[in-house]
Amino acid sequence: MRTPKIEALHRAIHWINERDSTYSIPCLGLDLSPLDSNSWLAGFTDADGCFSITVYDRKKNGVFLRTSVQTFFRIEVKQNYSREVTPNQGGSSYFTILSEIAAFFTVNLYTRVRKTEDKVFYAFVAVAHNSRSHEIVRKYFDSYPLYSSKYIAYKDWCVVQDLHRGSLNKDKLDKIKTIKNSFNSKRKVFDFSHLDSLNFERKL
């Protein structure tokens, strides 16, 4: 665990230990290993990450110049955990882990305020938006694949980046638009065959 949700894990462990004295499960501390040393960030992305593709027309004085394509990888989480978290558990703020994620992708960490009719939501946001951060994103997720439908989004996202390299001709742009039109919430067909390669070993 790397986030304030370690409090929920410890609470569950205490509950189990109180009801079964056969074996006492220890409460471990936060995982402080490098982010690229394991698949934790992939799991975190399956829950709170998002890949996006933007296609828009550039204009100057109302005159069309060219069509541009941008790709983003974004992680956004609320600023604070809903329960009290002790200092030994890392505290209740997500600032530390989101700062670490932003530094890993060599981008800045931003705050976001979103208002509804009766509530205000505060979040931390890290966005990989340039070639350097995209290279790190791809290297990581190629090493530690996603398990959810975001794996499919990631693969399409990579295809768009590859098509965008060099000159953007009509054929490439048409392919990008086709991918975008069935991306994320617009996707109708899902292929989870990547899960066939998962190996679950039972350790006795």
Regions found by a protein language model. Give the residues of each.
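Internal intein/HINT superfamily modules and their associated LAGLIDADG
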Residues: 1-204
